[in-house]
Amino acid sequence: LYKDHVIPDLRALKVLNRLRKKNFKDDTITLELVEELGKDGISVLDQTKYLKPLMPGPQIFTKRRPTENEMLDVAFGFKAAKAIGGMDLGQTVVIKDQAVMAVEAIEGTDACIRRGGMLARGGAVVVKTAKPDQDLRFDVPAVGLETLHSMMETGCKVLAIEAYRTLFVEKTSVLKEADCAGIAILSVEQEHL
């Protein structure tokens, strides 16, 4: 448990003990840390307060547009991503032909994309959404160059993010590379699928 003999201090042990009585889901751990910081008068702010310009509205960003079948996968993927988000599992799914190839869990977005893309054997759709009850102080969904590179490694063809609720970082570089690779990137609102 304590690799390299790094042992938590008494305060951290108390936090871990409280968590043991609850669960070790991402949101539970993070909320416990936010509450602990609050005891010292430290407020954790909404991450999006200063990052709204990085959270685009609905649009297609790339030269390549998703096909009709890929849009069916996007719609299916949104439902799946919201379902896993509601269980605090992750925020990303990889879909092909309306079948779930991978669901993000503790391994993170990029590992999920690589696993799902490999299982799909090319042509997969990646969908990233916010959790249904997303606490905007932490774990706001984000995509960037690493996301795109994971997709390119395994031949994924579409990245769909939730409009207004996903951070799109390194956008200029991402779009340039996506256009060269023939990958479609779009942001959508679930109610418009």
PLM-predicted stretches and their roles:
Residues 1-49:
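N-terminal glycine-rich phosphate/adenylate-binding segment common to multiple enzyme folds
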Residues 1-2, 51, 101, 167:
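Short, active-site-adjacent cap segments at secondary-structure transitions
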Residues 4-18, 31-32, 111-193:
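Feature captures the catalytic cores and cofactor-binding loops of soluble hydro-lyases/lyases
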Residues 23-27, 40-149:
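Conserved mixed alpha/beta catalytic, RNA-binding, or beta-rich assembly cores of soluble enzyme
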